[in-house]
Structures are given as structure tokens and as C-alpha cells.
Amino acid sequence: MGRFIFVSFGLLVVFLSLSGTGADFFCPSGWGSNNGHCYQAFNQRMTWEDAERFCSAQAKGGHLVSIETRAEADFVAHVVAERIETSFPHVWIGLRDEGKEQQCSSEWSDGSSVSYENWIEAESKTCLGLELDSNYHKWVNVYCGQRNPFVCEA
């Protein structure tokens, strides 16, 4: 009986120590995690729509990245700086003009509300990308058919 309790206790300790690894365990292989979300930057050059479809196919709940806070913007800029070749001036994010009175859609491609904004310019908005010149912190208008690298979030 004592041996059974000892083994059971040992298994409980192992389980509890592993349960703290959380987010990385559930992220697809090679993806980074932050605050319960998984992120991956891809160097493939695609149009905004193709990149969105690609992200959806990569992971359950995958979309182009939705940047909802300054802290998340900093994390995404870090991921991009580490993984995207610096020869690309723009990197797709999950926001674009949906043709609603020449204003940007009020939601990200994953359906979440736009609660944080960081525009470089406030002109007509088409598709949005992060700009190299701002170290991938500022958003810039980009023609949706342009082929750019992108960041997926799941």
C-alpha cells in the first residue's frame, strides 16, 4: 500500500510539473507562444487573401495576426525581426478595408474587434502591413494584391 501511494504521489508531481508548460505544448511545431496565443512568421510572399487562407490551413483557429495591445505589437515585431528577411518592406497583418464607406473594417480577420491601432498614416486603408522602417511596429496601407511575407496567429 505504501509503495502504491509513493508511486501515485510521484506521478502527481510529474503531471503537475508538466502542466505548467501550457501554451508551447499546444502550439504547432516551430511556432512561438505569447499570452495564450501561438505565432509564426512566414517568409513566403503571398497576397493578403492567400496569406489569410494559408494561416487558416496551418492551425486550428489560424488567421493573419490580430494585434490587440501594445505588448502584443512588441511581441509580433520581435517574431518578425527574428524570422522575416529584412529585404521585405511590409509584412501582412489581419486587417483590411472591407469596402464599408472607405473605412477600415472594425474587426480583424479572426473576427475580434479592433481595440488597438498604430497607423503610420490615416489615408484610405486597403490591406494593412507592418512596416520595416518602423521595425515592424507601425501599420501601413498596402495594396492587397501585393505579395508579402506574413504573420499567422492561432
Swiss-Prot record:
Q: In which tissues is it expressed?
A: Expressed by the venom gland.
Q: Which UniProt keywords apply?
A: Blood coagulation cascade inhibiting toxin, Disulfide bond, Hemostasis impairing toxin, Metal-binding, Secreted, Signal, Toxin
Q: GO CC: one term? A: extracellular region
Coiled-coil positions are none
SMART domains xrefs: CLECT
Signal is among the record's keywords? yes
SUPFAM superfamilies in the record: C-type lectin-like
Q: Where is the signal peptide?
A: 1-23
Primary residence: secreted
The protein's superkingdom reads Eukaryota
Show the InterPro entries listed in the entry.
C-type_lectin-like, C-type_lectin-like/link_sf, C-type_lectin/snaclec_domain, C-type_lectin_CS, CTDL_fold
| One of the record's GO molecular function terms | toxin activity
Binding, Ca(2+): 66, 68, 72, 153
Q: Where does it live in the cell?
A: Secreted
The C-type lectin domain is annotated at 34-153
| Disulfides per UniProt | 27-38, 55-152, 127-144
Q: Which family does it belong to?
A: Belongs to the snaclec family.
Q: What does this protein do?
A: Inhibits thrombin-induced fibrinogen clotting and factor Xa-induced prothrombin activation. Binds to thrombin and prothrombin exosites.
The record describes its quaternary structure and partners as: Heterodimer of subunits A and B; disulfide-linked.
Q: Which PANTHER family match?
A: MANNOSE, PHOSPHOLIPASE, LECTIN RECEPTOR RELATED (PTHR22803)
Could you tell me what this protein is called? Snaclec salmorin subunit A
Source species, please?
Gloydius brevicauda
